[in-house]
Amino acid sequence: MLTQEKITDALNDVLVPGISRSVSDMNLVQGFELQKNKVRISFASTALSESAQNWIGEKTREVIKGYGKGAEVEIEFLEKRPAEINRIENVIAIMSGKGGVGKSLVTSLTAIILNKQGYDVGILDADITGPSIPKMFGITLRPQGNDSGILPVQSANGIEIISINLFLSNEDEAVIWRGPLIGKAITQFWEDVLWGKLDFLLVDLPPGTADAPLTVLQVLPVTGTIIVFTPQDLTTMIVKKAVKMAQQMGKAVLGVVENMSYLYVPEINKKIEVFGKSRGAEMSLAAEAPLLARIPIDPELALLCDEGHIERYDSEVLKSYGAALATVIPASNKLH
């Protein structure tokens, strides 16, 4: 005999074609009605091709009949915009006033940590003219979708990713756009991508305090920021501008991360501060937020990024960063 609990369990087994998440995880289930052994299920057709809709319909009938023999299943698809469906608990912007400090690296490592902790995580690459997220994750697939929405591409471990580079014919093709077009692209990535249910959406920002960061902080419901910097005096001076931008726009600074903090040489068991002494305490004081991590210059990490296997990286530094993150992120808002 069919029950509402059995139907809910069955729908968790129906995966969305092109992405290894269920129709429930993508929040495509709009409701269902159960009368005795007959069930009527409503799905959103957002970002789904006709063949994908047909597949979901067939798979749904198959799994529900497995829970209740002789069950009658009616299915309908409703038009919905991604913005009506997405349920994203936390949006965290990774920012810095300076270029080349490793925002994309910190964004990726943060996503990997949260993913390992069991959260559903996505990355919105807002660095429209200099995207590097797909390269680090080894992603080359073009996002699927249609006029009703776009499906993000998943990493090997299930992190959802959207980036302008995934839409280009060649990865080294230049995106020569002025500010308004960049702002529009970021807004579309937020409103037109079917993210589904996410615990965290991390936004990788380009350097500076102009159009792109402004669009993200004004348009997206940012719940917190992480500031990235390196030890150089010139860098920390510029990065403080990003701290002030976040503060002036009422966005909480969750913490600061010092990248390229040192080089560890195991042969002599020594940390060499290549770019000078750590400025973690100084930046923590300026941001009024904790120092979450000091990420070293690590040849292994650099190689994994170049090879597109950043998710294979594991180190004590990463574990320490994860423990620090757990003290500042709103873990109580976990959806699953």
Language-model regions, residue ranges each:
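Residue-level signature of catalytic and energy-coupling elements of molecular machines
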Residues: 11, 29, 88, 99, ...
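Phosphate-binding P-loop
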Residues: 83-89
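Switch II (G3) loop of P-loop NTPases
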Residues: 145, 164-180, 187-215
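C-terminal lobe/tail of nucleotide-utilizing enzymes
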Residues: 2-4, 26, 45-59, 63, ...
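Inter-motif core of Ras-like GTPase G domains
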Residues: 213-234
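Short edge beta-strands and adjacent turn/loop segments
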Residues: 17-41, 79-80, 295
